[in-house]
């Protein structure tokens, strides 16, 4: 007489029951394919010149523009949570056509870098975003010609100057985000020629012209004069193979790490980049992705903490070596740092 199981032998049921390994929390932890820990996280921080106390950012609930003093306190807190890295963005008082404040030794980011390094030493990897848009009066990421277009090669010279200023102030990693052709090579030459051979470069290699950056631009008070956009230098969201070309070029120019930005809408890009290269691959869980979770959670529509961890798990599962996220501190606390 045939066994009752014969009808299922082709599928493996019930010999293999997938639910067996899901029946307890301990089993699920033991067999999980992806793990997110505080070690995977990088905290983006904003530091603003000319304020006496931290200022809330309305479109980024829970995130503030720091003073130099308060950003040091926050850096110490991140270190205590076992978060290994932070990245600084500056909001200067004065802006001009060439973004002079970006390379000013007394600029707000340089002061913050120096103060953080003095306070935490090597407990944290201190990164500095390297771009000009926060510092220019026109809002573009580079030097603008009379016709309103960005002059790629003139911008490279400024990027080199900014990189050296950041490294001299204490940045262990500079992170060029302007998407100029040749930016990594120009920065590497500038760093090496001034004695900063050990300063690493995290290249925003695949940075897309995304609609998800709005809250970030509120945080740094940036708008493009005349209502322009950055589509002439940031990547087209419709393109995937182009990202691999950008990444390979940056690595050939000397990038130590590469990054995909945004993360959630570009998980396929993260996965493709991870499969293609042997350097660490970061991903930026950007301001719009964060703000959507916070807004829905405030309305009681979702469990914001659970969704945040699910997002981070998805980004890690796609292949990210580390994740820049505004949820860094909260996630580290939830993960039991």
Regions found by a protein language model. Name each.
Residues 2-8, 12, 24, 37-42, ...:
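Alpha/beta enzyme core
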Residues 23, 31-34:
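N-terminal leader/domain-start detector
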Residues 19, 26-27:
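Acidic, Ser/Thr/Pro-rich intrinsically disordered transcriptional activation regions
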């Amino acid at each position: 007489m045939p066994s009752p199981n014969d009808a299922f032998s082709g599928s493996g049921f019930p010999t293999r029951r997938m639910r067996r390994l899901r029946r307890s929390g301990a089993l699920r932890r033991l067999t999980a394919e992806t793990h997110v820990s505080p070690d995977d996280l990088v905290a983006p921080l904003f530091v603003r010149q000319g304020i006496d106390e931290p200022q809330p950012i309305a479109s980024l609930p829970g995130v503030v523009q720091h003073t130099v003093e308060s950003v040091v306190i926050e850096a110490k807190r991140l270190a205590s949570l076992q978060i290994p890295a932070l990245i600084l963005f500056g909001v200067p008082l004065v802006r001009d056509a060439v973004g002079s404040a970006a390379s000013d030794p007394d600029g707000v980011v340089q002061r913050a870098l120096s103060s953080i390094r003095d306070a935490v030493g090597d407990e944290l990897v201190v990164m500095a975003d390297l771009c000009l848009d926060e510092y220019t009066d026109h809002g573009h990421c580079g030097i603008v010609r009379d016709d309103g277009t960005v002059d790629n090669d003139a911008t490279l010279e400024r990027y080199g100057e900014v990189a050296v200023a950041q490294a001299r102030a204490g940045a262990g990693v500079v992170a060029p985000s302007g998407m100029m052709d040749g930016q990594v090579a120009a920065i590497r030459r500038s760093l090496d020629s001034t004695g900063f051979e050990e300063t690493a470069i995290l290249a925003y290699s695949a940075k897309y012209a995304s609609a998800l950056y709005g809250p970030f631009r509120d945080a740094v008070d940036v708008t493009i004069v005349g209502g322009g956009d950055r589509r002439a230098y940031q990547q087209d969201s419709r393109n995937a193979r182009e990202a691999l070309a950008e990444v390979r070029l940056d690595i050939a120019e000397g990038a130590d790490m590469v990054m995909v930005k945004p993360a959630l809408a570009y998980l396929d890009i993260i996965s493709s980049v991870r499969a293609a290269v042997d350097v660490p691959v970061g991903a930026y869980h950007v301001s719009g992705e964060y703000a959507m979770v916070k807004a829905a959670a405030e309305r009681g529509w979702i469990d914001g903490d659970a969704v945040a961890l699910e997002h981070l798990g998805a980004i890690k599962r796609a292949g990210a070596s580390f994740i820049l996220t505004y949820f860094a501190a909260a996630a580290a606390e939830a993960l039991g740092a």
